[in-house]
UniProtKB/Swiss-Prot annotation:
Its main location: cytoplasm. It is found in: Cytoplasm. GO terms for molecular function: ATP binding; serine-tRNA ligase activity. Pathway: Aminoacyl-tRNA biosynthesis; selenocysteinyl-tRNA(Sec) biosynthesis; L-seryl-tRNA(Sec) from L-serine and tRNA(Sec): step 1/1. ATP binds at residues 262-264, 349-352. GO terms for biological process: selenocysteine biosynthetic process; seryl-tRNA aminoacylation. Homodimer. The tRNA molecule binds across the dimer. This is Serine--tRNA ligase. GO terms for cellular component: cytoplasm. It holds the Pfam family Seryl_tRNA_N. NCBIfam families: serS (TIGR00414).
Length: 426
């Protein structure tokens, strides 16, 4: 959430920066609400001052033994008006809060301006796509004889669910363990295990609610709604909600492996085949909580940590910086990492790494105490390190062999009991 003081003092500038990301700020509505708020506050302050003055007059009249009934009647009337004004002011504050909650984050000045994904800018490519001397298959055709079972997934749960059996399930587990170990042992992240359901307050804190409720799976329980996590970013970032962190404890680095649940409400007809877009998928998530002046450097570092996984796996990839029109709601700056998929002859997203600035921290009231003893908002970052299912897809396609087997990348073999190849079953 943006600082309302920024809108009050730099409304036109904020509107222009938001326009660069395709969001039209209703400046007239905001100005009207602000003018109404100011008028109400001024009137309320005047009434309070008048009531205080009259109360003194009542006290003086009583000390002199004079009749104060007329003044008391006026005080009573002022009290009624004050209550009405306070109720109106509370309603106005609620409307201002609703307006603020719908406003996306301001893009950092280093973000390229663009209307949509066509405005994204490639930063670097790493690795050379393999040349095959046979007809490449996609991950479904490769994976089905190896234990990828979309049919049973559909029987159990419907479209966009998959069952993995035997060596495929083991490869999936190996990837997650490899990612966790790399980030915890080499990059200094603290591994955490979190709930897979969170309350609405947590979803609000990281920006999923109220704007993106249709993308979530809601679990009603009595009078309260819980939500299946769309990413471990939600529970992990909320660790610092309503907390004041010691400056000496920053930066905080957490890594978590969770299933993620998304309705894919806006993805009808896209990636319906295979594991690219699922309602349930696993992801290893990286979260950092840092001082404000460190957030952009931390984004470069976090992105590099995600890239390390692809480098160790020997998978070709590229990094792009998202333009203003393609950024996520709460993002200040985002790098997408895209892995090469031979069957699609293109790069596909496997990680998104973002600095959120103080956008989430303001919603969560997540602060740290600086050296001067002043409480300041922290900055938060998150990124996939990596999406496990899509990494499995990339391994299958990039390491496939003509006989239908798949070579296991060397770094995964210790997690696979030394297995060097996945072989078709039956």
């Amino acid at each position: 959430m943006l600082d309302i003081q920024l809108l009050r003092t730099q409304l036109d500038t904020v509107a222009a920066r938001l326009a660069a990301r395709g969001y039209t700020l209703d400046t007239e509505a905001f100005t009207a609400l602000e003018n109404e708020r100011k008028a109400l506050q001024t009137r309320t302050q005047d009434l309070q001052a008048r009531r205080n003055s009259l109360s003194k007059q009542v006290g003086e009249a009583k000390r002199r033994g004079e009749d104060a009934s007329a003044v008391l009647a006026e005080v009573s009337g002022l009290g009624d008006e004050l209550k009405a004004n306070e109720a109106a002011l509370e309603g106005l504050q609620g409307r201002l809060a609703e307006l603020l909650q719908a406003i996306p984050n301001l893009p950092h000045e280093s973000v390229p301006v663009g209307r949509d994904e066509t405005g994204n800018v490639e930063i670097r490519r790493v690795g050379v796509p393999r040349s095959f001397d046979f007809q490449v298959k996609d991950h479904v055709d490769i994976g089905t004889p190896l234990g990828l079972d979309a049919e049973t997934g559909a029987k159990l749960s419907g479209a966009r669910f998959t069952v993995l059996r035997g060596q495929m399930a083991r490869l999936h587990r190996a990837l997650a363990q490899f990612m966790l170990n790399t980030h915890a042992d080499e990059h200094g992240y603290t591994e955490v295990y979190t709930p897979y359901m969170v309350n609405a307050t947590s979803m609000y804190g990281t920006g999923q609610l109220p704007k993106f409720e249709e993308d979530l799976f809601r679990v009603p329980r009595g009078d309260e709604n819980f939500y299946l996590v769309p990413t471990a970013e939600v529970p992990v970032t909320n660790f610092v909600r309503d907390e004041i962190v010691k400056a000496a404890d920053l930066p905080l680095r957490y890594v978590a492996h969770t299933p993620c649940f998304r309705s894919e409400a806006g993805a009808y007809g896209r990636d319906t085949r295979g594991m690219i877009r699922q309602h349930q998928f696993d992801k290893v998530e990286l979260v950092q909580v840092v001082r404000p002046e460190e957030s952009l450097n931390a984004l470069e570092t976090l992105t590099g940590h995600a890239e390390t996984i692809l480098k160790k796996l020997g998978l070709p990839y590229r990094v792009i910086v998202l333009c203003t029109g393609d950024m996520g709601f709460g993002s200040q700056k985002t790098y997408d990492i895209e892995v090469w998929l031979p069957a699609q002859d293109t790069y596909r997203e496997i990680s998104s790494c973002s600095s959120m600035g103080d956008f989430q921290a303001r919603r969560m009231q997540a602060r740290f105490k600086d050296e001067a003893g002043k409480n300041q908002l922290v900055h938060t970052l998150n990124g996939s390190g990596l999406a496990v299912g899509r990494t499995l897809v990339a391994v299958l396609e990039n390491y496939q062999n003509a006989d239908g087997s798949v070579t296991v990348p060397e770094v995964l073999r210790p997690y696979m009991g030394g297995l060097e190849k996945l072989l078709p079953q039956g």
